Amino acid sequence: MSVPKAKALLTVCAALLLCGCGQALSEREIVRAVFFARQQGAYSACLLLADQNAESDGVQYKTASARGDTAAQALHLAEDALPGRLYYGLLDLAALPPGCDWADAQTLGTLLYDKAQPAPELSVFVLNTADHSWAADAASLYEDMKAVEQEYALHCGLQ
């Protein structure tokens, strides 16, 4: 193989790698936060997503949630409820269930760790025991938690 052909082949390979063969962010479901709850031995997971199709100004959100026997099952069922590919690269908040012990926190952290890459920082909160309607409360919980971080200059993230 001559040098020009090898160079051309390498150029084509590099172009294919860098051309964005995947979907653009505007075509993906962008996950901003994940909330976990545990009730009666079952887990529920709620994904708070940036609603890129909202027509009003400002940040708009939508949710997808599901219940499962384990946190992983609940998370996967919530993901499967969405039509597009998920993008966790902008995930910046996770909320753990009330009464979460260290072992549960490690399990949930491991579950999110691979998905959240390359998120620069992931803040972790523990929910209180109040009942939550994910569809109604997830966006306000997220905004309240982010406001607390900013107001009190909290830095409770995993980097």
Language model: regions and residue ranges:
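Membrane-proximal alpha-helical signals and transmembrane carboxylates
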Residues: S2-A14, L18-Q159
